[in-house]
Design a protein with these regions (language model features):
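Positively charged, polyanion-binding regions of nucleic-acid-associated proteins
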Residues: 8-39, 45-49
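Conserved catalytic cores of phosphodiester-cleaving nucleases, focusing on short active-site segments
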Residues: 139, 174-178, 185-195, 207
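Acidic-basic catalytic patches of nuclease active cores, encompassing PD-(D/E)XK
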Residues: 116-162
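Active-site metal-binding core of divalent-cation-utilizing nuclease and nuclease-like domains
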Residues: 149-181
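Charged low-complexity interaction tracts in eukaryotic proteins
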Residues: 6-8, 14-15, 20, 60-107
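Domain-level recognition of nuclease-like catalytic cores that cleave nucleotide substrates
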Residues: 225-281
């Protein structure tokens, strides 16, 4: 019974959020690719709709940025092949932006590259099997970012919450700094997802904005990672492209890795990796 009550409250709140965000969108709508609004408009919309004021107005925007799609009535106004997203433009200010429809997920036909597992046994014993924190931990201990980017990389911060001018509050799962053989410096903002989740453009946009603000002198290369199962995961390098004011999330590179015990990696497999490397070069 308690579960049903909780579920009904969640559905009711979702319905309120849909009505409020629809009101704000259509009150400002014009046939452009950018529509600005602020937090006070959310409060005004709830008042006009006779909806008791939501205590945490920011959760309305957060829901549509990271947890759910905007109502279909809003996306029906988008150009063919596009959808509306919400991006932060400052503290308490936002924009609806047109973006190509692109919820990215790992490819299903990639070779899994076996890597000897360097995760400490005590960490394996106590770390959860496949949540985002466990993924970040295994990637860090096995220096997967170094392998993927072919350079030396260092984790400097994880689960960072901060405020960026022109964006507002953001959270970055983990940040790596890297240096290549030519001495060029890079910053890699990482986002981790649990199995079944998809990568969206909003998170990548805010990661890039954060790095441009804090690490303006280095090259930013966003990374997405996701468990495929307990010991296999996908690593993707992403990029944002923009044409005619329409945003697009693209994948630059993708590799799948599998952590194994040393007995599970044969000499024949190692020879095959070498052959594949020679074929590529």
């Amino acid at each position: 019974l308690e579960w049903l009550i909780y579920e009904n409250k969640g559905l009711l709140m979702a319905s309120k959020y849909d009505k409020i965000i629809e009101k704000v969108f259509f009150d400002n709508y014009s046939k452009t690719s950018k529509i600005s609004f602020d937090r006070e408009e959310l409060a005004l919309a709830s008042k006009k709709l006779n909806i008791p004021r939501i205590k945490n107005l920011g959760d309305i925007v957060y829901s549509y940025r990271f947890r759910k799609d905007l109502p279909h009535t809003i996306n029906e106004t988008a150009r063919t092949g596009c959808e509306w997203i919400i991006v932060g433009t400052g503290i308490g200010s936002y924009e609806f932006r047109l973006s190509q429809i692109a919820k990215i997920e790992p490819a299903s036909n990639r070779q899994k590259i076996k890597i000897p597992d360097s995760t400490p046994e005590i960490v394996k014993m106590y770390a959860p099997a496949n949540d985002e924190q466990a993924l970040l931990t295994k990637v860090r201990y096995n220096r997967i970012i170094d392998l993927f980017m072919s350079m030396t990389c260092y984790s400097i911060q994880n689960h960072l919450r901060t405020t960026v001018n022109g964006i507002g509050q953001i959270e970055v799962d983990e940040i790596y700094l890297g240096i290549n053989k030519n001495g060029i410096h890079f910053v890699f903002p990482c986002q981790a997802k649990s199995p079944g989740d998809k990568f969206g453009i909003v998170q990548v946009l805010q990661d890039i904005s954060f790095c441009s603000s804090r690490y303006s002198s280095v090259i930013c290369r966003p990374i997405a990672m996701q468990f495929l199962n307990d010991n296999s995961f996908a690593i993707l390098e992403t990029r944002i492209e923009e044409e005619d004011n329409i945003l697009k999330l693209v994948v630059i590179d993708e590799k799948h890795y599998k952590l194994v015990n040393r007995d599970d990696l044969s000499h024949e497999e190692i020879k095959n990796y070498r052959k594949l490397s020679n074929d590529v070069t």
